[in-house]
C-alpha cells in the first residue's frame, strides 16, 4: 500500500505569527531611515492608493548580460499619490527607554476631511475639533506660547516629524475621512528641520519632492483579506491520501498525547489575509504628473514616452477596474504590491544602502500599455478604437435625424 513518507519539513513560516486580522488598515512605519545631517532636509515617507496594474516595455541597460540592449516586458503597479497636506509638527527626545514625545503643534487651519479622522461618527458629532486650539494662533498669549514651544523643540529635540494627511476629495473613492500619519523629517540640523516644517504648515507636499526616478523604496500595507480558511489553503500542508477517513484537507497528527495541549507551531485553520506586511526594494519606474490645465486645455498625456508619442493618459480604456481614473500624480512601481484596489499604501524610503547593479540601473521606458483591463483589450486609445471600428449605428442615426 502507498503511504506518505514519515519525515517532512514543516509547512509555512512561523515568522509571521499570529496570523490574524491586522489591527490597522493603514500600513504603519515601524522604523524610518537613519538620519544624515549632511543631506538636505527631506521627508522619508508618503501615502498612496493602489489603482491597478499594467505592463511596460523597456530597454535593459546591463552590460555583460544576455538581455543587454534588448526589450523586455515588465508588469508594473500604478499607485495614485495626490499631494499630502502638512497639518502638524511633533518633536521627540531620545531617552534610555527610546523616543518620547516632547511637543506637538498643530496648524491654525485644518480641513474637515482631516478632522473626520478624530470622530467615529462625523454626521452626529458637534464638529468642534480644534476650535479652541486654533485660537492659539490668533491671540498674543497663544502666539508667545507657540514660539516658546518651537524654541524649546529646537533646544531639546533630536527627532522632528510632521503630521500630514491625504486629500480624499481628489480621489475617485467614496471615503471622505483622510488618512493621517507622522512622517519623519531627515537631513540638516534640528533647527533646519523645524524651520522647513514650519514653512510647510498647511501647505501641499507633492510626491516628487519625496521620491525620485529609479529610486528603490519599501511598500507597507495590509494584504488582501481571504476570510476564514482551512489548513491546506492557509498553511499549504500536503493533502492526505484519497481514502482518508473524515476528510483530506487536514493535518492528521496535531501532536502527542502529552503535553496535553496543541503547540502553537501546529498548522490550524483560521484567518488568511488582511495581514500587515512590509515589502522592501520596489523600484520606481516612473513618477507621473496628474492632469493639468495649460493655456485653457486639459493636458492628459502622462503615458507618452520618447518612443511612443501618442497622446494618451496612464488610464486604460474604461479606467482601472474597480478603481476608476487616475487624475493626480502617480508612482509606477515594478511588480506587484500588497492589498486590493483602493487600498491605502505607505511608501517609505529604503532603509538599506543600495549597491546592486539592478537597483542603480537607469530605467528607459519605451511603451506603457493602456488597453482595457476588462477583457481582451486591443486598443491603446479611443481614437484608435474609433478608427478601427468605424462609425457606430447610433451615431449614424443621430446624424441623419440632425440633418
Swiss-Prot record:
It is found in: Nucleus, Nucleolus; Cytoplasm. Residues 18-31 have a biased composition (Basic residues). SUPFAM superfamilies: Translation proteins. It comes from Macaca fascicularis (Crab-eating macaque). It holds the Pfam family Ribosomal_L3. The modification N6-acetyllysine is found at residues 136, 286, 294, 366, 373. GO terms for molecular function: RNA binding; structural constituent of ribosome. The keyword Oxidoreductase does not apply. Component of the large ribosomal subunit. Interacts with DHX33. Belongs to the universal ribosomal protein uL3 family. Component of the large ribosomal subunit. The ribosome is a large ribonucleoprotein complex responsible for the synthesis of proteins in the cell. There is a cross-link at residue 294 (Glycyl lysine isopeptide (Lys-Gly) (interchain with G-Cter in SUMO1)). This is Large ribosomal subunit protein uL3.
Amino acid at each position: 500500500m502507498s503511504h506518505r513518507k514519515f519525515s517532512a519539513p514543516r509547512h509555512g513560516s512561523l515568522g509571521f505569527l499570529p496570523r490574524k486580522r491586522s489591527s490597522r488598515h493603514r500600513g504603519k512605519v515601524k522604523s524610518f531611515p537613519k538620519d544624515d545631517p549632511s543631506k538636505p532636509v527631506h521627508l522619508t515617507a508618503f501615502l498612496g492608493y493602489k489603482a491597478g496594474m499594467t505592463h511596460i516595455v523597456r530597454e535593459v541597460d546591463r552590460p555583460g548580460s544576455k538581455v543587454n540592449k534588448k526589450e523586455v516586458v515588465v508588469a508594473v503597479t500604478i499607485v495614485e499619490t495626490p499631494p499630502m497636506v502638512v497639518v502638524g509638527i511633533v518633536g521627540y527626545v531620545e531617552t534610555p527607554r527610546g523616543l518620547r514625545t516632547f511637543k506637538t503643534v498643530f496648524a491654525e487651519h485644518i480641513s474637515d476631511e482631516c478632522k473626520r479622522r478624530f470622530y467615529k461618527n462625523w454626521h452626529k458629532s458637534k464638529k468642534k475639533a480644534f476650535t479652541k486650539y486654533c485660537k492659539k494662533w490668533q491671540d498674543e498669549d497663544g502666539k508667545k506660547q507657540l514660539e516658546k514651544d518651537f524654541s524649546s523643540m529646537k533646544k531639546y529635540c533630536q527627532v522632528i516629524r510632521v503630521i500630514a494627511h491625504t486629500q480624499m476629495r481628489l480621489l475617485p473613492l467614496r471615503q471622505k475621512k483622510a488618512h493621517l500619519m507622522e512622517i519623519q523629517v531627515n537631513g540638516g540640523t534640528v533647527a533646519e528641520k523645524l524651520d522647513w516644517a514650519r514653512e510647510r504648515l498647511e501647505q501641499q507636499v507633492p510626491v516628487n519632492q519625496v521620491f525620485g526616478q529609479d529610486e528603490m523604496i519599501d511598500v507597507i500595507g495590509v494584504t488582501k483579506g481571504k476570510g476564514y480558511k482551512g489548513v491546506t489553503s492557509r498553511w499549504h500542508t500536503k493533502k492526505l491520501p484519497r481514502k482518508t477517513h473524515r476528510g483530506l484537507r487536514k493535518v492528521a497528527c496535531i501532536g502527542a498525547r502529552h503535553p496535553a495541549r496543541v503547540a502553537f507551531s501546529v498548522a490550524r485553520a483560521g484567518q488568511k489575509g488582511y495581514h500587515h506586511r512590509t515589502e522592501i526594494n520596489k523600484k520606481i519606474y516612473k513618477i507621473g504628473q496628474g492632469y493639468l490645465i495649460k493655456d485653457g486645455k486639459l493636458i492628459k498625456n502622462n503615458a507618452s514616452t520618447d518612443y511612443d508619442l501618442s497622446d494618451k493618459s496612464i488610464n486604460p480604456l474604461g479606467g482601472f477596474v474597480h478603481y476608476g481614473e487616475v487624475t493626480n500624480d502617480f508612482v509606477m512601481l515594478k511588480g506587484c504590491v500588497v492589498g486590493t484596489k483602493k487600498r491605502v499604501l505607505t511608501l517609505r524610503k529604503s532603509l538599506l544602502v543600495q549597491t546592486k547593479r539592478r537597483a542603480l540601473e537607469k530605467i528607459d521606458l519605451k511603451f506603457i500599455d493602456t488597453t482595457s483591463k476588462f477583457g481582451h483589450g486591443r486598443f491603446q486609445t479611443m481614437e484608435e478604437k474609433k478608427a478601427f471600428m468605424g462609425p457606430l449605428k447610433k451615431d449614424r442615426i443621430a446624424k441623419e435625424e440632425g440633418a
